[in-house]
Each structure stands twice: as structure tokens, then as C-alpha cells.
């Protein structure tokens, strides 16, 4: 269903089946409708949502390298200085990977919901599933 928003932009409002069996045309609080124009003007449209399987977080090899670097105890000052610089570089690389991981995690869908909101959403989805299963059973039992 296409409606005009208060600022005269076209919004796509999909009908939603509520837990009590009613069809609701306004969106749920968990999935707000934002027009494509509003998304791109707010900078939202550029972010794509990742899944957990798509996360690229590799920190163990760097941590291993840092531990190996710290365990080395060279006797010469020149070697100590070079090893110290290598360790600092690896630590900086680890910090960059942590920041990259934070950015990726921020793109996960639902990450901005707290535990209670997630539980409410899960309960709503379970109720919808039960209702749809009942409707399917009722439809299959109906003879034409």
C-alpha cells in the first residue's frame, strides 16, 4: 500500500498480520517505514546490513604475533628497538582490527535493540507463526 507521509513523500506501507489476527497497515515499532529519499538524504541507505556469517573479524593471529613479540628478549639494543617498533606496529594493527570489528557489529540488524525489545519481538514473531500455522490448517481443512 502506498501512502503519502506528512512531508508528501511516498511511503510503502506493507500490511502486517498482528498476533490477534488483525491486519495492520501501519508499521510496527521495530520496523519503521522510511522512504528511499529519506534514507539517502540521512545517509542510512549507504549502509548494508551484515549477517553474523559475513563478519570479517580475525584478531587471533595478531594477538599470537604480539605475544610472540613480547616473549622475545634480545640482548642487543638495536634489536630491542626494532622488536619494540614491530610490537608497536602489531598493537596498532590490532587496534585497527578492533575498530573494524566495531563498525561491522554496528551494521548487524537488530543490534540497536535491548534485550527486552528483542524478547518482545521474538514473542510477537512466535505469535504470528502460530497464527499463520492455524490459518494454514484451517485453509487445508476447508473443503470447496
Swiss-Prot record:
Keywords: Activator, Coiled coil, Nucleus, Transcription, Transcription regulation. The lineage of its organism: Eukaryota, Metazoa, Ecdysozoa, Arthropoda, Hexapoda. Residues 85-143 form a coiled coil. Pfam families: Med9. This is Mediator of RNA polymerase II transcription subunit 9. It comes from the Eukaryota. Its main location: nucleus. One of its GO terms (biological process) is regulation of transcription by RNA polymerase II. InterPro entries: Med7/Med21-like, Med9, MED9_metazoa. It is found in: Nucleus. Component of the Mediator complex, a coactivator involved in the regulated transcription of nearly all RNA polymerase II-dependent genes. Mediator functions as a bridge to convey information from gene-specific regulatory proteins to the basal RNA polymerase II transcription machinery. Mediator is recruited to promoters by direct interactions with regulatory proteins and serves as a scaffold for the assembly of a functional preinitiation complex with RNA polymerase II and the general transcription factors. Belongs to the Mediator complex subunit 9 family. One of its GO terms (molecular function) is transcription coregulator activity. GO terms for cellular component: mediator complex.
